[in-house]
């Protein structure tokens, strides 16, 4: 998830440096930097890498992680592109300003109100405003209903929009340029974001019905992600690590299932990706309806719950309930088996609710994956890797999988962990042991970094 610590114009801040230094304290084998935008466009307090001016701050971040991890932690940056999404509008504002009037609107209104026959556009809009809501919804197209009820969202199939039609021509160079900047900043590699609600995830999806050679068939849907990879590889060279994160299952109606993911995995391995990291769900397609004035959030619907499962993910009484623990490992296992059967040794990264040494070790021993990744558990306790290495597992602060952190992300607030907050009331004691007061969130109520820990 995005921690919301960058500046509003996408630069590394002291809070960003502190955030990643704290993760580096635990000396994990690798850290993947948050989703970082490849375009030089306003995107709020999200890190960006779409211009050379972002490189100095990112270089400082790399140096900070190297220092705090004593050089033991490799550092990758996740590169992402995303299409436009708008907040859910007020009904009156949508009808008076945003709705593009069509002949069908006038024809349907004419059957309801004779005044529509000779009404000008402004008068027609006022007639729409006064309609009962169910009647209005029946008059609008499915896409117009979504724009009204959820907010406007671009799709890769909106090829009537020139900038969407041109994505295959534009994206390879944008990703390649961003990857080169990452190399210049000192990162060990990049993770191309092909998962969840990203642009390239939408190209891989079965919902991608583009008819220009970049949709419909598996080959067509994988074409642009592969072209992006080849452009990146050509730009950064063979020694720079280039992997991707993609979905083992979209978990939406009409979306791509594991069979597609296995086929994509083989093609990605054949192309030369250095690793494949597997996730699930997290789509806008089934997101919950946002409040007026807020944007849809891709982790609020069934696919989002599969992406970031909580302890409540399984209904009561389910005999084979897995809960959030290792929930995506079967997907990683299936993809790994397909890649191996095709003769490739590309490492597969398993993730999703891995919070104990036993589960991580079993996933590796059983052949579910070759590498283990853990986000929420590492947020709860950035030192857990070091504690396990030192035989101090009983001191690990275990994630409760309540998604307290995810709820903050949804509200665009600085992400923290509920397990940290109980220490905030004793800053004096912490200052005596660590030499500094805990950094606090902008509202002053939450610590910004995990409590310090020392093996001594």
Predicted feature locations:
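Flavin-dependent oxidoreductase catalytic cores
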Residues: 1-456
């Amino acid at each position: 998830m995005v921690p919301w610590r960058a500046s509003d114009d996408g630069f590394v801040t002291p809070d960003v440096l502190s955030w990643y230094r704290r993760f580096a304290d635990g000396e994990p084998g690798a850290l993947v930097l948050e989703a970082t935008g490849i375009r030089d466009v306003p995107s709020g307090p999200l890190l960006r890498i779409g211009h050379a001016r972002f490189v100095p701050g990112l270089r400082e971040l790399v140096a900070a992680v190297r220092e705090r991890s004593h050089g033991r932690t490799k550092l990758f940056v996740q590169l992402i592109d995303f299409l436009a999404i708008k907040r859910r509008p007020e009904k009156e504002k949508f009808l008076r300003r945003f709705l593009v009037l069509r002949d069908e609107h006038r024809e349907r209104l004419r059957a309801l109100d004779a005044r529509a026959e000779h009404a000008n556009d402004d008068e027609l809009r006022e007639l729409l405003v006064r309609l009962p809501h169910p009647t209005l919804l029946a008059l609008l197209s499915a896409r117009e209903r979504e724009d009204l009820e959820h907010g406007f969202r671009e799709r890769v199939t909106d090829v009537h929009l020139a900038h969407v039609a041109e994505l295959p021509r534009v994206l390879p160079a944008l990703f390649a340029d961003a990857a080169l900047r990452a190399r210049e900043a000192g990162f060990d590699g990049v993770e191309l974001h092909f998962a969840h609600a990203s642009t390239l995830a939408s190209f891989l999806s079965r919902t991608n019905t583009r008819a220009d050679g970049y949709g419909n068939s598996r080959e067509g849907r994988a074409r642009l992600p592969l072209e992006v990879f080849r452009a990146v590889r050509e730009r950064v060279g063979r020694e720079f690590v280039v992997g991707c994160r993609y979905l083992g299952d979209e978990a939406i109606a009409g979306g791509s299932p594991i069979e597609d993911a296995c086929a994509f995995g083989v093609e990605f391995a054949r192309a030369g990706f250095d690793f494949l990291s597997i996730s699930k769900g997290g789509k806008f397609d089934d997101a919950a309806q946002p409040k007026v004035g807020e944007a849809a959030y891709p982790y609020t619907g069934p696919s989002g719950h599969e992406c970031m499962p909580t302890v409540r993910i399984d209904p009561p009484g389910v005999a084979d309930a897995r809960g959030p623990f290792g929930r995506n490992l079967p997907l990683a296992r299936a993809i790994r088996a397909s890649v191996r059967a095709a003769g490739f040794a590309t490492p597969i990264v398993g993730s999703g609710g891995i919070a104990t040494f036993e589960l991580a070790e079993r996933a590796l021993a059983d052949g579910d994956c070759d590498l283990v990744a853990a986000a929420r558990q590492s947020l709860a306790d950035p030192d857990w890797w070091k504690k396990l290495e030192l035989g101090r597992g009983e001191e690990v602060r275990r994630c409760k999988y309540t998604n307290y952190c995810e709820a903050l992300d949804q509200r665009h607030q600085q992400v923290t962990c509920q397990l940290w907050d109980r220490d905030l009331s004793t800053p004096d004691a912490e200052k005596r042991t660590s030499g500094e007061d805990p950094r606090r969130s902008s509202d002053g109520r939450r610590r910004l970094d995990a409590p310090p820990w020392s093996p001594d």
